[in-house]
Amino acid sequence: MTTESTDGIATIVQGEDRTLTLWATDEKGNPFSLTGNTEIVVKLPGTTSAIERKKTDGQVTVVSADAGKFQCTLTAANTAAMKSGSKQSFQAEVTFASGKRIIVFDSVLTVKKAPV
């Protein structure tokens, strides 16, 4: 399932497969170009350590480099290991030949426990 949130909050249920569609923006809210990136690592809150998904491992895909749009695929095992809670933050580290940029997605993730 792909998540494209209209309210800015992505909701994930632990133990389900998910694909998050994300847009990187600069400080002014303009699209942050992903053109020329060599790696994108998405780091999500886990119960014991961060859940990392990488472009070079095929877990992150650039959809539109100019628009800053990319997707992060999460397996059921990934979401089961995520920390439950509301309005959590996570980040994406985008690496270019010239250096690394960290994009923070602040208070936009809710992870719920699966109903019994």
Tell where the protein language model's regions lie, with residue ranges:
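Contiguous segments within soluble domain cores/interaction surfaces
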Residues: 1-116
